[in-house]
Protein backbone atom coordinates (compact mmCIF):
# COMPACT_ATOMS: atom_id res chain seq x y z
CA UNK A 1 0.00 0.00 0.00
CA UNK A 2 2.90 2.35 0.77
CA UNK A 3 4.34 1.76 -2.71
CA UNK A 4 0.97 2.48 -4.33
CA UNK A 5 0.59 5.74 -2.38
CA UNK A 6 4.08 6.86 -3.42
CA UNK A 7 3.39 6.02 -7.08
CA UNK A 8 0.08 7.92 -6.97
CA UNK A 9 1.67 11.03 -5.45
CA UNK A 10 4.62 11.06 -7.84
CA UNK A 11 2.51 10.48 -10.94
CA UNK A 12 -0.11 13.07 -10.03
CA UNK A 13 2.66 15.62 -9.62
CA UNK A 14 4.13 14.69 -13.01
CA UNK A 15 0.75 14.66 -14.75
CA UNK A 16 0.00 18.24 -13.78
CA UNK A 17 3.28 19.72 -14.97
CA UNK A 18 1.81 20.68 -18.35
CA UNK A 19 -0.55 23.32 -16.97
CA UNK A 20 -1.50 24.76 -20.37
CA UNK A 21 -2.75 21.40 -21.68
CA UNK A 22 -4.62 20.73 -18.44
CA UNK A 23 -6.35 24.13 -18.58
CA UNK A 24 -7.36 23.53 -22.21
CA UNK A 25 -8.78 20.07 -21.51
CA UNK A 26 -10.60 21.04 -18.32
CA UNK A 27 -11.83 24.25 -19.94
CA UNK A 28 -13.20 22.16 -22.79
CA UNK A 29 -15.10 19.95 -20.35
CA UNK A 30 -16.64 22.99 -18.67
CA UNK A 31 -17.60 24.66 -21.97
CA UNK A 32 -19.24 21.49 -23.30
CA UNK A 33 -21.21 21.08 -20.07
CA UNK A 34 -22.37 24.72 -20.06
CA UNK A 35 -23.43 24.44 -23.71
CA UNK A 36 -25.30 21.20 -23.01
CA UNK A 37 -27.08 22.65 -19.96
CA UNK A 38 -28.04 25.78 -21.92
CA UNK A 39 -29.34 23.67 -24.82
CA UNK A 40 -31.44 21.52 -22.51
CA UNK A 41 -32.66 24.64 -20.73
CA UNK A 42 -33.84 26.34 -23.92
CA UNK A 43 -35.24 23.32 -25.79
CA UNK A 44 -36.63 21.12 -23.01
CA UNK A 45 -36.65 22.61 -19.51
CA UNK A 46 -38.08 26.07 -20.29
CA UNK A 47 -41.02 24.75 -22.39
CA UNK A 48 -41.89 22.27 -19.62
CA UNK A 49 -41.73 24.94 -16.91
CA UNK A 50 -44.00 27.22 -18.96
CA UNK A 51 -46.82 24.68 -18.76
CA UNK A 52 -49.62 25.20 -16.26
CA UNK A 53 -48.57 22.03 -14.40
CA UNK A 54 -44.93 21.14 -15.15
CA UNK A 55 -44.21 17.41 -15.14
CA UNK A 56 -41.76 16.88 -12.29
CA UNK A 57 -40.78 13.46 -13.67
CA UNK A 58 -39.59 15.09 -16.91
CA UNK A 59 -37.71 17.75 -14.97
CA UNK A 60 -35.95 15.03 -12.98
CA UNK A 61 -35.09 13.30 -16.26
CA UNK A 62 -33.51 16.46 -17.71
CA UNK A 63 -31.62 17.14 -14.48
CA UNK A 64 -30.44 13.52 -14.47
CA UNK A 65 -29.10 13.79 -18.02
CA UNK A 66 -27.20 16.99 -17.22
CA UNK A 67 -25.70 15.53 -14.03
CA UNK A 68 -24.84 12.29 -15.85
CA UNK A 69 -23.12 14.33 -18.56
CA UNK A 70 -21.21 16.36 -15.97
CA UNK A 71 -19.88 13.27 -14.22
CA UNK A 72 -19.00 11.53 -17.49
CA UNK A 73 -17.30 14.57 -19.02
CA UNK A 74 -15.32 15.29 -15.86
CA UNK A 75 -13.99 11.75 -15.57
CA UNK A 76 -13.75 11.03 -19.30
CA UNK A 77 -11.90 14.13 -20.43
CA UNK A 78 -9.49 13.72 -17.53
CA UNK A 79 -8.67 10.15 -18.65
CA UNK A 80 -8.32 11.29 -22.27
CA UNK A 81 -6.10 14.24 -21.34
CA UNK A 82 -3.76 12.58 -18.86
CA UNK A 83 -3.77 8.86 -19.66
CA UNK A 84 -2.22 8.77 -23.13
CA UNK A 85 0.25 11.60 -22.46
CA UNK A 86 1.39 9.93 -19.24
CA UNK A 87 1.93 6.52 -20.87
CA UNK A 88 3.79 7.92 -23.90
CA UNK A 89 6.06 10.06 -21.72
CA UNK A 90 6.90 7.24 -19.34
CA UNK A 91 7.61 4.70 -22.07
CA UNK A 92 9.72 7.08 -24.16
CA UNK A 93 11.81 8.08 -21.13
CA UNK A 94 12.20 4.52 -19.88
CA UNK A 95 10.56 5.34 -16.54
CA UNK A 96 8.63 2.07 -16.45
CA UNK A 97 11.76 0.02 -17.14
CA UNK A 98 13.54 1.80 -14.30
CA UNK A 99 10.73 0.95 -11.89
CA UNK A 100 10.71 -2.66 -13.09
CA UNK A 101 14.29 -2.96 -11.87
CA UNK A 102 13.16 -2.12 -8.31
CA UNK A 103 11.44 -4.45 -5.79
CA UNK A 104 8.11 -2.68 -6.43
CA UNK A 105 5.45 -5.14 -7.60
CA UNK A 106 4.21 -4.66 -11.16
CA UNK A 107 0.64 -4.81 -9.90
CA UNK A 108 1.35 -1.90 -7.54
CA UNK A 109 2.75 0.12 -10.46
CA UNK A 110 -0.35 -0.59 -12.54
CA UNK A 111 -2.84 0.25 -9.78
CA UNK A 112 -0.89 3.30 -8.59
CA UNK A 113 -0.60 4.81 -12.07
CA UNK A 114 -4.27 4.10 -12.80
CA UNK A 115 -5.35 5.80 -9.57
CA UNK A 116 -3.10 8.79 -10.32
CA UNK A 117 -5.25 9.35 -13.42
CA UNK A 118 -8.57 8.48 -11.77
CA UNK A 119 -8.40 10.62 -8.61
CA UNK A 120 -8.19 14.04 -10.36
CA UNK A 121 -11.04 12.94 -12.65
CA UNK A 122 -13.11 11.87 -9.64
CA UNK A 123 -12.63 15.30 -8.07
CA UNK A 124 -13.38 17.14 -11.31
CA UNK A 125 -16.40 14.97 -12.12
CA UNK A 126 -17.78 15.36 -8.60
CA UNK A 127 -17.38 19.14 -8.64
CA UNK A 128 -18.97 19.51 -12.10
CA UNK A 129 -21.87 17.28 -11.04
CA UNK A 130 -22.46 19.21 -7.82
CA UNK A 131 -22.25 22.55 -9.64
CA UNK A 132 -24.72 21.26 -12.25
CA UNK A 133 -27.18 20.15 -9.56
CA UNK A 134 -27.10 23.53 -7.81
CA UNK A 135 -26.94 25.72 -10.94
CA UNK A 136 -29.76 24.00 -12.86
CA UNK A 137 -31.99 24.08 -9.79
CA UNK A 138 -31.48 27.74 -8.94
CA UNK A 139 -31.49 28.97 -12.54
CA UNK A 140 -34.51 26.97 -13.73
CA UNK A 141 -36.41 25.00 -11.09
CA UNK A 142 -36.43 26.81 -7.74
CA UNK A 143 -38.27 29.95 -8.95
CA UNK A 144 -41.17 27.87 -10.35
CA UNK A 145 -41.38 24.38 -8.83
CA UNK A 146 -38.88 24.32 -5.99
CA UNK A 147 -35.69 22.30 -5.59
CA UNK A 148 -35.65 19.17 -7.78
CA UNK A 149 -33.65 16.22 -6.52
CA UNK A 150 -33.78 12.45 -6.86
CA UNK A 151 -31.48 10.16 -4.85
CA UNK A 152 -30.98 7.74 -7.76
CA UNK A 153 -29.63 10.57 -9.91
CA UNK A 154 -27.06 11.26 -7.20
CA UNK A 155 -26.14 7.57 -6.81
CA UNK A 156 -25.63 7.23 -10.57
CA UNK A 157 -23.60 10.43 -10.90
CA UNK A 158 -21.48 10.12 -7.76
CA UNK A 159 -21.05 6.34 -7.60
CA UNK A 160 -21.91 4.39 -10.78
CA UNK A 161 -20.17 6.69 -13.30
CA UNK A 162 -16.95 6.95 -11.22
CA UNK A 163 -17.01 3.15 -10.83
CA UNK A 164 -17.17 2.78 -14.63
CA UNK A 165 -14.20 5.09 -15.09
CA UNK A 166 -12.20 3.47 -12.31
CA UNK A 167 -12.54 0.11 -14.07
CA UNK A 168 -11.96 1.69 -17.50
CA UNK A 169 -8.81 3.39 -16.21
CA UNK A 170 -7.47 0.04 -15.00
CA UNK A 171 -8.25 -1.50 -18.40
CA UNK A 172 -6.68 1.37 -20.37
CA UNK A 173 -3.49 1.37 -18.30
CA UNK A 174 -3.27 -2.43 -18.41
CA UNK A 175 -3.40 -2.35 -22.22
CA UNK A 176 -1.00 0.60 -22.34
CA UNK A 177 1.56 -1.09 -20.09
CA UNK A 178 1.50 -4.46 -21.80
CA UNK A 179 1.10 -3.22 -25.38
CA UNK A 180 1.13 -0.02 -27.40
CA UNK A 181 -0.14 3.14 -25.66
CA UNK A 182 -1.91 4.15 -28.87
CA UNK A 183 -4.22 1.11 -28.54
CA UNK A 184 -5.11 2.12 -25.00
CA UNK A 185 -5.68 5.68 -26.19
CA UNK A 186 -8.15 4.52 -28.86
CA UNK A 187 -10.25 2.83 -26.18
CA UNK A 188 -10.20 5.88 -23.90
CA UNK A 189 -10.90 8.39 -26.69
CA UNK A 190 -13.68 6.35 -28.30
CA UNK A 191 -15.49 5.39 -25.09
CA UNK A 192 -16.46 8.91 -23.96
CA UNK A 193 -18.32 10.20 -27.05
CA UNK A 194 -19.88 6.83 -27.90
CA UNK A 195 -21.06 6.12 -24.35
CA UNK A 196 -22.44 9.58 -23.60
CA UNK A 197 -24.18 9.86 -26.99
CA UNK A 198 -25.85 6.45 -26.77
CA UNK A 199 -27.08 7.04 -23.22
CA UNK A 200 -28.46 10.55 -23.90
CA UNK A 201 -30.19 9.40 -27.10
CA UNK A 202 -31.81 6.46 -25.31
CA UNK A 203 -32.90 8.61 -22.37
CA UNK A 204 -34.53 11.22 -24.60
CA UNK A 205 -35.94 9.08 -27.43
CA UNK A 206 -37.11 5.96 -25.60
CA UNK A 207 -38.88 4.98 -22.40
CA UNK A 208 -36.49 2.09 -21.71
CA UNK A 209 -34.24 4.20 -19.47
CA UNK A 210 -35.12 6.76 -16.84
CA UNK A 211 -32.19 8.77 -15.47
CA UNK A 212 -33.99 9.23 -12.17
CA UNK A 213 -34.70 5.53 -11.54
CA UNK A 214 -32.78 2.71 -9.87
CA UNK A 215 -32.67 0.82 -13.18
CA UNK A 216 -30.41 3.47 -14.71
CA UNK A 217 -28.06 3.14 -11.74
CA UNK A 218 -28.14 -0.64 -12.11
CA UNK A 219 -27.37 -0.47 -15.85
CA UNK A 220 -24.33 1.75 -15.29
CA UNK A 221 -23.14 -0.39 -12.39
CA UNK A 222 -23.55 -3.42 -14.67
CA UNK A 223 -21.38 -1.75 -17.31
CA UNK A 224 -18.70 -1.18 -14.68
CA UNK A 225 -18.93 -4.87 -13.75
CA UNK A 226 -18.47 -5.90 -17.40
CA UNK A 227 -15.33 -3.76 -17.68
CA UNK A 228 -14.07 -5.14 -14.36
CA UNK A 229 -14.51 -8.70 -15.68
CA UNK A 230 -12.48 -7.74 -18.78
CA UNK A 231 -9.74 -6.43 -16.51
CA UNK A 232 -9.70 -9.67 -14.52
CA UNK A 233 -9.58 -11.74 -17.72
CA UNK A 234 -6.71 -9.69 -19.18
CA UNK A 235 -4.69 -9.55 -15.96
CA UNK A 236 -2.60 -12.52 -17.07
CA UNK A 237 -0.89 -10.16 -19.56
CA UNK A 238 0.63 -8.15 -16.71
CA UNK A 239 4.12 -9.64 -16.58
CA UNK A 240 7.50 -7.91 -16.46
CA UNK A 241 8.57 -9.65 -19.66
CA UNK A 242 5.52 -8.44 -21.59
CA UNK A 243 5.86 -4.88 -20.28
CA UNK A 244 9.57 -4.78 -21.15
CA UNK A 245 8.97 -6.16 -24.66
CA UNK A 246 6.15 -3.69 -25.35
CA UNK A 247 8.62 -0.80 -25.85
Regions found by a protein language model. Name each.
Residues 79-100:
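Transmembrane helix boundary and interhelical loop/hinge segments in multi-pass membrane proteins
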Residues 119-167:
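Secretory targeting signals
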